[in-house]
Every structure is written in C-alpha cells, then in structure tokens.
Amino acid sequence: MTPESVMMMGTEAMKVALALAAPLLLVALVTGLIISILQAATQINEMTLSFIPKIIAVFIAIIIAGPWMLNLLLDYVRTLFTNLPYIIG
C-alpha cells in the first residue's frame, strides 16, 4: 500500500462525502434563507421558527435524493472492495 494509493482513496472518499452532503446542506441553506427573509419582513424574531421548515425540507430532500445518494455510496464501496486486492498488494 503506497502513500499514493492511500491519498487516492482518501481523496475519492472526500469527494463522495461532499457529493452526499451537498444536496442536503444546500436545501437547508436555502430553506433557512427563505425563512430568515420572511422573519425579517414580518419582524418575527423567533429563533426556533426556522428549525421545523428546515427539518421538513431536508427530510423531503432525503426522500427525493435518497436513491441517488445510496447508489453513489454503493458504487464507491463496490469499487473500493473490488480494488482492495490491487491496493493491498
């Protein structure tokens, strides 16, 4: 196992983790921004008001993007296990 192969595996793992987290984080960011704009427009300064819409939006995003996320993760793990004998020795 060379340092290059370890770096390659780590880089690929970080890319997959970023690809899995990005859609959910973007949905939470956009939902929070919309709720904050509505709170500023109506002058409602309740901090807990944005949590429920964010949770609902992220849950819907998981339902919609879940199969894609699962396929991406399974492809990565399948590739990792397939290449494991070549990486080890």
UniProtKB/Swiss-Prot annotation:
GO CC annotation terms, alphabetical: bacterial-type flagellum; bacterial-type flagellum secretion apparatus; plasma membrane; type III protein secretion system complex
Main location group: membrane
Transmembrane feature ranges: 16-40, 55-75
GO-annotated biological processes: bacterial-type flagellum assembly; bacterial-type flagellum-dependent cell motility; chemotaxis; protein secretion by the type III secretion system
Subcellular location: Cell inner membrane; Bacterial flagellum basal body
Pfam families, per the entry: Bac_export_3
Record membrane topology: Multi-pass membrane protein
Keyword set includes Repeat: no
Keywords on record: Bacterial flagellum, Cell inner membrane, Cell membrane, Membrane, Transmembrane, Transmembrane helix
Family: Belongs to the FliQ/MopD/SpaQ family.
Function field: Required for the assembly of the rivet at the earliest stage of flagellar biosynthesis.
PANTHER family registered for this protein in UniProt: FLAGELLAR BIOSYNTHETIC PROTEIN FLIQ
Protein name, UniProt field: Flagellar biosynthetic protein FliQ
The encoding gene: fliQ
